[in-house]
Protein backbone atom coordinates (compact mmCIF):
# COMPACT_ATOMS: atom_id res chain seq x y z
CA UNK A 1 0.00 0.00 0.00
CA UNK A 2 1.27 3.44 -0.90
CA UNK A 3 1.33 5.57 2.27
CA UNK A 4 2.83 8.69 0.65
CA UNK A 5 -0.66 10.10 0.10
CA UNK A 6 -1.44 9.93 3.80
CA UNK A 7 1.86 11.49 4.89
CA UNK A 8 1.71 14.37 2.42
CA UNK A 9 -1.93 15.18 3.20
CA UNK A 10 -1.95 14.49 6.93
CA UNK A 11 -2.91 18.05 7.85
CA UNK A 12 -6.03 18.01 5.68
CA UNK A 13 -6.94 14.48 6.69
CA UNK A 14 -6.81 15.49 10.35
CA UNK A 15 -9.12 18.46 9.73
CA UNK A 16 -11.73 16.38 7.90
CA UNK A 17 -11.46 13.61 10.50
CA UNK A 18 -11.95 16.03 13.39
CA UNK A 19 -15.04 17.46 11.71
CA UNK A 20 -16.37 13.98 11.03
CA UNK A 21 -15.88 12.78 14.59
CA UNK A 22 -16.95 16.13 15.99
CA UNK A 23 -20.32 15.38 14.43
CA UNK A 24 -20.71 12.71 17.13
CA UNK A 25 -22.12 15.30 19.52
CA UNK A 26 -25.20 15.51 17.32
CA UNK A 27 -25.46 11.82 16.51
CA UNK A 28 -28.19 9.63 17.94
CA UNK A 29 -25.75 7.28 19.69
CA UNK A 30 -24.23 10.17 21.68
CA UNK A 31 -27.46 11.92 22.63
CA UNK A 32 -29.00 8.57 23.60
CA UNK A 33 -26.36 8.17 26.32
CA UNK A 34 -27.97 11.08 28.15
CA UNK A 35 -31.61 10.38 27.28
CA UNK A 36 -32.36 8.79 30.65
CA UNK A 37 -30.91 11.75 32.53
CA UNK A 38 -32.80 14.20 30.34
CA UNK A 39 -36.10 12.35 30.90
CA UNK A 40 -35.42 12.26 34.65
CA UNK A 41 -34.45 15.94 34.95
CA UNK A 42 -37.41 17.16 32.90
CA UNK A 43 -39.88 14.62 34.36
CA UNK A 44 -40.96 13.51 30.89
CA UNK A 45 -42.00 10.14 29.52
CA UNK A 46 -40.32 8.12 26.80
CA UNK A 47 -43.04 9.30 24.42
CA UNK A 48 -42.50 12.97 25.22
CA UNK A 49 -38.73 12.59 24.88
CA UNK A 50 -39.18 10.78 21.56
CA UNK A 51 -41.46 13.56 20.33
CA UNK A 52 -38.98 16.26 21.37
CA UNK A 53 -36.14 14.39 19.70
CA UNK A 54 -38.18 13.78 16.54
CA UNK A 55 -39.21 17.43 16.35
CA UNK A 56 -35.63 18.66 16.76
CA UNK A 57 -34.42 16.14 14.19
CA UNK A 58 -37.13 16.96 11.63
CA UNK A 59 -36.59 20.71 11.97
CA UNK A 60 -32.86 20.14 11.60
CA UNK A 61 -33.35 17.99 8.51
CA UNK A 62 -35.64 20.57 6.91
CA UNK A 63 -33.11 23.34 7.48
CA UNK A 64 -30.25 21.11 6.32
CA UNK A 65 -32.17 20.41 3.13
CA UNK A 66 -32.48 24.16 2.58
CA UNK A 67 -28.95 25.24 3.64
CA UNK A 68 -26.86 22.18 2.79
CA UNK A 69 -25.64 23.74 -0.44
CA UNK A 70 -23.81 26.58 1.30
CA UNK A 71 -20.94 24.18 2.01
CA UNK A 72 -19.92 24.64 -1.60
CA UNK A 73 -20.41 28.42 -1.73
CA UNK A 74 -18.44 29.68 1.28
CA UNK A 75 -14.82 29.37 2.36
CA UNK A 76 -14.25 26.01 3.96
CA UNK A 77 -12.23 27.36 6.87
CA UNK A 78 -14.82 29.98 7.85
CA UNK A 79 -17.66 27.50 7.58
CA UNK A 80 -15.76 24.89 9.60
CA UNK A 81 -15.08 27.38 12.37
CA UNK A 82 -18.72 28.48 12.39
CA UNK A 83 -19.95 24.88 12.61
CA UNK A 84 -17.54 23.97 15.42
CA UNK A 85 -18.37 27.09 17.46
CA UNK A 86 -22.11 26.58 16.95
CA UNK A 87 -21.91 22.92 17.94
CA UNK A 88 -19.90 23.81 21.04
CA UNK A 89 -22.43 26.53 21.89
CA UNK A 90 -25.35 24.09 21.80
CA UNK A 91 -23.40 21.54 23.86
CA UNK A 92 -22.72 24.26 26.44
CA UNK A 93 -26.31 25.49 26.30
CA UNK A 94 -27.48 22.06 27.49
CA UNK A 95 -26.24 23.04 30.96
CA UNK A 96 -28.87 25.78 31.12
CA UNK A 97 -31.81 23.83 29.70
CA UNK A 98 -34.67 24.44 32.12
CA UNK A 99 -37.74 24.03 29.96
CA UNK A 100 -39.02 21.94 27.07
CA UNK A 101 -38.81 24.77 24.52
CA UNK A 102 -35.12 25.30 25.22
CA UNK A 103 -34.56 21.53 25.12
CA UNK A 104 -36.14 21.36 21.65
CA UNK A 105 -33.92 24.23 20.51
CA UNK A 106 -30.83 22.48 21.89
CA UNK A 107 -31.70 19.14 20.28
CA UNK A 108 -32.30 21.00 17.03
CA UNK A 109 -28.91 22.72 17.29
CA UNK A 110 -27.05 19.53 18.16
CA UNK A 111 -28.70 17.63 15.32
CA UNK A 112 -28.25 20.44 12.79
CA UNK A 113 -24.64 21.37 13.52
CA UNK A 114 -23.53 17.89 14.54
CA UNK A 115 -25.37 15.18 12.64
CA UNK A 116 -26.13 17.45 9.71
CA UNK A 117 -23.56 20.13 9.07
CA UNK A 118 -20.32 18.76 10.53
CA UNK A 119 -20.64 15.37 8.85
CA UNK A 120 -21.78 16.93 5.56
CA UNK A 121 -18.98 19.48 5.64
CA UNK A 122 -16.31 16.85 6.25
CA UNK A 123 -17.46 14.88 3.19
CA UNK A 124 -17.71 18.02 1.04
CA UNK A 125 -14.17 18.99 2.06
CA UNK A 126 -12.97 15.51 1.11
CA UNK A 127 -14.43 16.08 -2.33
CA UNK A 128 -13.00 19.61 -2.65
CA UNK A 129 -9.51 18.97 -1.34
CA UNK A 130 -8.99 15.46 -2.67
CA UNK A 131 -10.72 15.31 -6.04
CA UNK A 132 -8.27 12.73 -7.42
CA UNK A 133 -8.08 10.66 -4.22
CA UNK A 134 -11.59 11.08 -2.87
CA UNK A 135 -12.00 7.35 -2.27
CA UNK A 136 -8.82 7.12 -0.20
CA UNK A 137 -9.90 10.06 1.90
CA UNK A 138 -13.40 8.81 2.58
CA UNK A 139 -11.96 5.39 3.42
CA UNK A 140 -9.63 7.10 5.91
CA UNK A 141 -12.62 8.64 7.66
Question: Where does each model-flagged region fall?
Answer:
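Intracellular juxtamembrane helix-capping segments at the cytosolic ends
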Residues: 116-130
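Extracytoplasmic
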Residues: 11-50, 63-67
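Hydrophobic core of transmembrane alpha-helices in multi-pass small-molecule transporters
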Residues: 21, 90, 101-117
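Short hydrophobic/small-residue motifs within alpha-helical transmembrane segments
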Residues: 54-61
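C-terminal ends and interior cores of transmembrane alpha-helices
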Residues: 85-98
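Helix-to-loop junctions at the C-terminal end of transmembrane segments
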Residues: 62-76
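Helix-loop junctions at membrane interfaces in 12-TM secondary transporters
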Residues: 10-11, 95-106
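Helix-breaking motifs and short loop linkers at transmembrane-helix boundaries and internal kinks
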Residues: 43, 75, 96-101, 131
Amino acid sequence: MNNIFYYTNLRWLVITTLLYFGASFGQTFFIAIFAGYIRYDFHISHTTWGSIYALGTCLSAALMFKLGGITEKFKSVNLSIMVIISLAFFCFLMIFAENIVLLILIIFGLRFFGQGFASDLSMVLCGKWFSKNRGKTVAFL
